[in-house]
Amino acid sequence: MKRSLKNNPFVANPLLRKMEKLNRREDKILIRTWSRASTIILTMIGHTIAIHNGKEHLPIYITDYMVGHKLGEFAPTINFHEHAKNDNKSRRSKMRIDY
C-alpha cells in the first residue's frame, strides 16, 4: 500500500541532518547508513551513500531517477550462488519407490 500524500516521505533524522550539513558545505563525502527504509529525496542527488546490506556497506551513487525509491532497494541482502553442475547432493533428484 502506498504512503498517504498527506505524510512526508520517511527519512531517518540523522541521515537528513548529515545531508543538510553536506549540502551547506558543498562536500561530497561517503555517508554510512543502516537506514534502508529511508526514502531518497531531492537533497540526496549527487551524494554517495553506503547502505548496509546486513554484512557490509555498499556504496551507491544517488541519481535523479532514484528519487522516491527506498535506499534498501539498491543494496541486495542475499546473493544466490548456483549449484555446481556435477554436484548431485545439492540438486534434487527424483526418488522412485518401487513396491
UniProtKB/Swiss-Prot annotation:
Task: Kindly report the protein's main subcellular placement as a broad class.
Answer: plastid
**This protein's GO CC annotations:** chloroplast; mitochondrial small ribosomal subunit
Keywords assigned by UniProt?
Answer: Chloroplast, Plastid, Ribonucleoprotein, Ribosomal protein, RNA-binding, rRNA-binding
**Compartments, record wording:** Plastid, Chloroplast
Please indicate which superkingdom the organism of origin belongs to: Eukaryota
Q: Tell me which PANTHER family the record gives.
A: RIBOSOMAL PROTEIN S19P FAMILY MEMBER (PTHR11880), SMALL RIBOSOMAL SUBUNIT PROTEIN US19M (PTHR11880:SF8)
Q: What does this gene product do? A: Protein S19 forms a complex with S13 that binds strongly to the 16S ribosomal RNA.
| Name of the protein described by the UniProt record | Small ribosomal subunit protein uS19c
Which species is listed as the source?
Answer: Oenothera argillicola
Gene it is expressed from: rps19
